[in-house]
Amino acid sequence: MKGEQRMSLDGIRIGFCMTGSFCTFEKAFAVTERLVQQGAKLVPIMSFNAASISTRFGTAEENIKRLETIAGCKVIRTIEEAEPIGPKKMCDIMVVAPCTSNTAAKLALGLTDTPATMAVKSHLRNARPVVIAISTNDALAGCAKNIGYLQNLRNYYFVPYAQDNCEKKPNSIVAEFELIPETIQSALDGIQLQPVIRVK
């Protein structure tokens, strides 16, 4: 019932889409493990960059394998594979974590040129919720208008976020990844988890 917090994610089909904020991949993987432990069924998705770029945070192959191991199925890595998500009603909710400024900009403009943005677009055709876990160094600069735009759209919900290093990176914002399960629970009931802006 709307307004009542769900105690479990058992049986909930969660599209979990990772984009290229590689420094937060470890947090994202930890969340996917929690979601599976809570009974959720994951539909894993990666943007082109997330699935192809190797960094000090892991090789592309390692990251793909890790997500597939947690989810128990193959990662969706192409636009063609992502397109049926909506028509087949594959997900009850879509999570983009981490969501880069590039992905946020494309979502705000309705661009669907990556598996991530196609997954969200296809999912939204069913008027089902999308949860954004923003992670970008320009959240309070160039990306601010896109974050604000998405927050004002129906069916979009944001994981609460905070400045991660206000002295050295004053424009940087990172979502509180540990709040993703709670944000999902609220979004499934049509409620934005509050407060959205957190202070560390």
Each predicted region: which residue ranges?
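A cross-family phosphate/adenosyl-ligand binding-site feature
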Residues: 2-130, 135-200
